[in-house]
Amino acid sequence: MSEVRLKSEFWLKAQLRLCDQNCLPAVIARRGDADAGQVLVKVIQSMQACEVLAQRYDDDAQRVWTVVSHGVERDCDAYIAREADVDPDLWVLEIEDPKGQYRPDGEEPRR
């Protein structure tokens, strides 16, 4: 049986609302396929610290949020640009989170 998933656009709009409720500035920086585009979340912690999160499958075939790039913002932007070159349906959500409050789907991302 296939996994039930929310449409990408719906999930992103929910994340924007959650960020707004928690006073975290957030913006959809890149729009992809409304139904099934992959989502990258760029979390900007400071001028020198940034992470990119993506959903991946773990060893138990469960989807988990994973840090796929980290470092200064330009390194994270380069990772996103490479992903966008191969995936035109890619979405990018950017969040300013200096206190490290953001948790996608309420879970701590894996490193």
What are these regions (language model features)?
Residues 1-111:
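Polybasic/polar functional segments that serve as interface/processing modules
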